[in-house]
From Swiss-Prot:
Any GO BP: 'de novo' pyrimidine nucleobase biosynthetic process
PROSITE patterns for this protein: DHODEHASE_1 (PS00911), DHODEHASE_2 (PS00912)
Catalytic reaction annotation: (S)-dihydroorotate + a quinone = orotate + a quinol
CDD domains: DHOD_2_like
Protein name: Dihydroorotate dehydrogenase (quinone)
InterPro entries referenced in this protein's UniProt entry, alphabetically: Aldolase_TIM, DHO_dehydrogenase, Dihydroorotate_DH_1_2, Dihydroorotate_DH_2, Dihydroorotate_DH_cat, Dihydroorotate_DH_CS
Membrane topology per record: Peripheral membrane protein
Keyword ATP-binding: no
Enzyme Commission number(s) of this protein: 1.3.5.2
Protein source organism: Hahella chejuensis (strain KCTC 2396)
Class of the enzyme per the UniProt entry, highest EC level: oxidoreductase
Cross-referenced Pfam families: DHO_dh
Length: 341
């Protein structure tokens, strides 16, 4: 059955139910050995970045597999890397449903999930048991009830657990669905937290004899000056990379649609242009000294190419996968692989 046929069925269901059923179907197909029969071989054009060899430049963004339950099935879809999470130290339910909405007319999604996950101990066990041996990123966050001034302790608690299993770790300070989280992107709050996180990275490196890169995921809802300010701080603290961007609070172009005014972060096609602009500004500000991974509104191969031309070294997809299916992964990887240089 083609993805487009499956989508017709899945899109008749509420968005969160569709999400959960899709992942369970993927796991069943993988366990039955069926995915290899239907999925094309992964496109290979290796990218060397942060001391890691990525088989291709297209990865899965965090948010689809929050607990690491579906890594092995997702690995069959052609991704050059997979990012799981966001995971927090303690399990939490997230916000009450309904909390996930499709805006099909604009190929968009609004979510206010609120870091629902089973906690870092569960995630660590899933990472330990996975068969997938490729590049795995782990996206870490803070619990909702942890005060912002104590956020670093939550990130460090997660890092301490997942470090042995992660290829890289993403510090998520940009979700719009955890109160006060985005304030950590600026000023003394960011500097203080990054210092503690870098100290933790050094301890983990010494303890495990293995350096795991740390990247910071930023929001799209910043002025150019704010993007440059964040970039300077990332450089000051020798962060290994950045992901641009998370979801947006803007509702430009979707206000009149059903669910268009729901609270939460907007992703998909309406985010494409803004996210690419932030990627470009961030790359300029970072002066090529640390790499940028582009995420946000990658709905086509051309979108992926535009992100790379804006300066990104890798791209991630999520909403595009929901609307286009696995074909997007190969199309985007081939398009990036075909670029000169």
């Amino acid at each position: 059955m083609s993805y487009q046929l499956a989508r017709q069925f899945l899109f008749r269901l509420p968005a969160e139910a569709s999400h959960n059923i899709s992942l369970k179907m993927l796991k069943m197909a993988d366990n039955a050995g069926m995915l290899g029969m239907f999925m094309p071989q992964m496109y290979s054009r290796p990218v060397e970045l942060m001391g890691i060899t990525f088989p291709n430049a297209v990865g899965l963004a965090a948010g689809l597999d929050k607990n690491g339950d579906y890594i092995d099935g997702l690995s069959k879809l052609g991704f050059g890397f997979i990012e799981v999470g966001t995971v927090t130290p303690k399990p939490q339910d997230g916000n009450p449903p309904p909390r996930l909405f499709r805006l099909e007319e604009r190929s968009a999604i609004i979510n206010r999930m609120g870091f629902n996950n089973y906690g870092v101990d569960y995630m660590t066990e899933r990472l330990r048991k996975k068969k997938y041996g490729g590049v795995i990123g782990v996206n870490v966050g803070k619990n909702k009830d942890t005060p912002a001034e104590e956020a670093a302790s939550d990130y460090i608690a997660c890092i301490n657990k997942v470090y042995p299993y992660a290829s890289y770790i993403t510090i998520n300070i940009s979700s719009p669905n955890t109160p006060g989280l985005r304030a950590l992107q600026f000023g003394d709050s960011l500097r203080s937290m990054l210092q503690e996180i870098k100290d933790c990275q050094e301890r983990m490196n010494q303890q495990h004899g293995r350096y795991v890169p740390f990247v910071v995921k930023i929001a799209p809802d910043m002025s150019d000056d704010e993007v440059h300010m964040v970039a300077r701080t990332l450089l000051d603290y020798n962060m290994d990379g950045a992901i641009a961007t998370n979801t947006t609070l803007s509702r430009e172009g979707v206000e009149s649609l059903a669910h268009g005014k729901e609270q939460g972060g907007l992703s998909g096609a309406p985010l494409t242009k803004r996210s690419t602009h932030v990627v470009k500004e961030l790359c300029v500000a970072l002066e090529g000294r640390i790499p940028v991974i582009a995420s946000g509104g990658v709905m086509s191969a051309q979108d992926a190419v535009d992100k790379v031309r804006a300066g990104a070294k890798l791209v991630q997809v999520y909403s595009g996968l929901i609307y286009r299916g696995p074909v997007l992964v190969r199309e985007a990887a081939e398009a990036i692989g075909g670029l000169d240089g």
